Each structure stands twice: as structure tokens, then as C-alpha cells.
UniProtKB/Swiss-Prot annotation:
Gene of this entry: rstn6
Residues reported in the UniProt entry to bind FAD: I106
Record EC number: 1.-.-.-
Pathway: Antifungal biosynthesis
Keywords recorded for this protein, A-Z: FAD, Flavoprotein, Glycoprotein, Monooxygenase, Oxidoreductase, Signal
Cofactor(s) named in the record: FAD
Entry protein name: FAD-dependent monooxygenase rstn6
Family membership: Belongs to the FAD-binding monooxygenase family.
Function per UniProt: FAD-dependent monooxygenase; part of the gene cluster that mediates the biosynthesis of the tetrahydropyranyl antifungal agent restricticin that acts as an inhibitor of CYP51 and blocks the ergosterol biosynthesis. The highly reducing polyketide synthase rstn3, the short chain dehydrogenase rstn4, the cyclase rstn5, the FAD-dependent monooxygenase rstn6 and the enoylreductase rstn7 are required to generate the first stable intermediate desmethylrestrictinol.
Organism (species): Aspergillus nomiae NRRL (strain ATCC 15546 / NRRL 13137 / CBS 260.88 / M93)
Amino acid sequence: MYDVIVIGAGWCGLVAAKTYLQVCPDARLLLVDGDSSIGGTWSKERLYPHLVAEAHHGLFEFSDLPMRRDTVLPDGRIPSAAVHDYLTEYATKFDLIDRIRLNTWIENVRREPAVIGDNEAPRWMLTVAGSCEQIPTKKIIIATGLTSEPYMPFLPGRQEFEGEVLHSKALGHPQTGDRISDPSVRHAVVYGGSKSAFDAVYLLLRAGKTVDWVIREQGGGPSMMTPLSILGQPSFRLNNSRLLALFSPHPFDTTVKASWWQRVMHRRSGRLAQLAVIGFWRILAYLLQRPWKYNQSANGRRLRPLLALDSLFWSPATLGVMTHPELWDDIHSGERVTIHRQAITALGKDKRVILDNGVELSADLVVCATGWHARHTLFKPEEQLAVGLPSAVSFDPKSQSEWINLQRKADQEIIEEMPILQKSPVPSVPFRCEDDYHLYRFIAPSREPPSHERSIAYVGFLRTAGAPIVYEAQSLWATAYLTGALDVPGPSERISEVARTNAWIRRRYICGRKVPFALFDFLPYVDMLYRDLGVNPHRKANMVAEICGLYQPRDFQGVVSEWLASRGVKDIENV
């Protein structure tokens, strides 16, 4: 039986495994992944031509292995193949390759109680899809993240449709590449308005296709795409400065008193402070949106973010970096791409795609860039709530009433403490408390049954712009939690904290009403995790650099060793 199994061999899983082994070098650890190569989102089978990472060189790496400069483009952009190669190099350096089992899709995870008369404690049992194999383990780390199970919309008539329908996740499959390069495929429809839709449209146009780009009028609208650079610096770097977080109200300050700035600008702030905050975000949004000249064409106007200059602050749709800005020339010319702000209601014979305004399009290929499932199928629906995951199954009446009351109380506290969030656009659908993630610190179930105690943790279940920095912090926190080296509050305090952070996310980020989100607040979140661990999160030499400087993964180099040293343990990697 394994001591711990990590499910997922992408960014989250690799650093979770490396960190656990650094703390517990003798542990029997296994990584499993359903793909045929490591990398998760950046596995070989998910890469396709022109795909480029949003983060620039120096930001998309872990603290203990720099990405080689000769693998990236001259302007610092990182090709997808370089990301995959980097993760392979990381797994090799830290001796993870022999512990990884690929082509192993876990169909179900269940908790088995201890057998009477057996000396073994309760264990987790993982069932491998397509076989009768079951793998036992004492502990599990779920590192599949929030982009592993594609969401495909229901499209009536799909069986009669004579073209091909696929999710953007499949764009890297060899057969998809063959299909796109086939000269008989001339017309394509892309459905969705996220960053992946922009990438799909670019790929198809460069392959010589004509594209009808369909984005629903309802929902969060198209992503607000930022330019590659702003004020002479890569725009992605903005997120890696504490300066941006200063203007974002958040609940992650765990010190006795919130900072002076937080109190003045966000905590029970007055009208002038709120105007200053909104003004800051509108000016920044203007600078980021100005290069695209939305009013230059009908296509451009249809890609205008839903809330215009307020789209950056409230984030009705996920943000993205325009890794291929030349796409805007195609968008504005309209010669080979037409944008429709409609929904697809059906597919028909003769390769027809029918929109809700009655317009019929012709398509040899339909690419659904429609995001990811918020549901997680590793656990049965009736077991999901017990492990902190959202579920279609309801809580028992007592627990449901408790969570509803906690939600209401937490929401009231959030708007009292951060009045600006009272102006958050009203959600379009009512919320079930069962739709929330109930994860303390977004890592540990808020209320574990006694048989589950400290045996399950999650890494990568918070969407941020600082992935490597966040994943490293989460991995150390999860390892400390699973090994009993971290003190955590009791269930009552944990569930109150979970209700509070969930209430904040719903108010702060519109797109966070589907999955946990902390776009501009990830550094304060990381601070909180390291404070829990007794590690200093402030890595800069002085206050000016701390506030205005760029935070990179390398700033946290050696953090695991620091934590081990604080516990009087020698790190074998540094001996």
C-alpha cells in the first residue's frame, strides 16, 4: 500500500509530489495521470501549433529550477513545447519519473474503513478506469486542478451533424491536426469567448480556414484580453506585484490588525476611498483595452468586455493575455472571421449550425471552447460534499440549514467590512450552498469525518495568475497538513472561514461564482499560507521593493528547507 498517491501529473501534481518527498524522503509515493505524457494542460497531447503561455520567461517556473532562456522566444514568450519540456526536466531532476504512472485514469476514489482485527488504519481505494484494478493508499493529494474535465454544451442534432464537433482540449490530438490541415475542411465555427477561443480562432485562421466565432449574449461575455506589454513591461507581470493587490479588497490578512492601507481603502471605506479604488481599476482597464480599438469594426464591438472599463475589477469573464496580437488585424478586417453574439441552439444535416436568431451557418468543424466542468467525478455524488467538493446532491437538512445561515452571515460581514463589494453585480441565478467548494485555505476539507482525518488534500483548486508561486505554497501547506506538522483550527472555525472566503469570491469576482478565484489577490493568499507555516512570506530586501517590485517564483527558493529548519529537520537536498 502506498503512503500517498498524487492524482494528476501537471504543474500541481509534480510540485506536490516533489514537496512531499522533500519532507518525507522515505515515503512510498505514486503519481497517476490519465494522459500519455506528463504536463496536465501542457502534456504533449494538448499542445498545438502557435500555442504560447500567457506568462513571460521567469514567471512560469518553480523556485528551484529556472527555465532555460534558450527555449523561449526572443521577446520572452514561452512556446507550449518549452513548457512541456520544462515540466519533464523538473520531474527528472527531482526523481519523479519512476514514480509516475501514465495512461492511468482514476475512475473512482472511495474511503474504506479499517477492518476489525486488522492493524491497518482506514485507507483510500482508487479504481482504475477500464479495468478491475484497485490501488490502495493511506493518503491522497488531488492535483487535477480545475481544467481537467472539459465541458461540452448540449447541442441538439449533433448525431445528424455531418461535420466534426470537438472540445478545444482536443486541438493538440494528432487526428485533430490532420483534420485541420485537410483542405476539404474550409469552414469552422468556434463556440465560446474565453482565451482558449481566441487561440482556437488564431489556429484555424493560420490554417487557412474561414471562421464563424459564436459567443453567447448571456453569461460573462468575451474575455478581456490584455496586450503583451504595458508601459514597456510584460502585462502579465502586473499580477506579480503587491501594488495591484493593494487596490483589491481581500480577506487574506491574518495579522491581528489589517494593514493601514487595507483599513483606509477597503475596510469600512468611505466614498472617496471607493472612488479611488474604482478609478485605479478603470484607468488600468483603459490602458489594457486601448490597443484593441474595439470601435474600429463590428467584429471589434462584439468583443468588447461585458462591463467595459469595470470588467477588469469585477471580472465577468476570465482574463487573458493576447499572445498573438496580430489576430486583431483579422478580427477588424472581417475577411475570414465573423463574430456572432448569439447562442447555438442546434446542429443540423448538411453541416448546418443554427443560432438562436435563426441564422444558419455552414461548418465542417465546430470547436467548443466552452471551459471546464465544475463537478468532479473522482468521487460519487453522494460522497463529494464530505470531501469538500461541490455536488448535485444536497446536504442533509441540518447541515444545509447551517451552511445557508453561515453563507448569509458571511456575506453580510464581507459587505460591511468591504463596502465596495456591495456594488457587485447581482448573480443571474440563485446559489445552492452545495455548489461551493468547502475547502479550508482551498486545500483541506472544512469538516472531515473522523475516518478521513488528515488523509486528503487538494492542490490547484484556486484559479490565480500566479500559478507556480501558489502551487508551491499550497504543496508545502498540504504536506504539513497531511503529516500532522501543521496546527489547524477546529471544525467550527474552519467552516466559518470557508463560508467567509466563498462569500468574498462571489462578491469580488463574477467568474468566481463557478470556481474559486483570486486573480489579483494571490500574493496575500500566499502570505497567509506561509504565515500558517511560520515562514516569512516577505522575500524582498526593503519595503519599496516589497510593494512595487516584481515577485517571481525564484524569490521563494529554499522555502521548504526554511520550514524544515524551523522544525529542526535537515533537508537532505541541502546536506
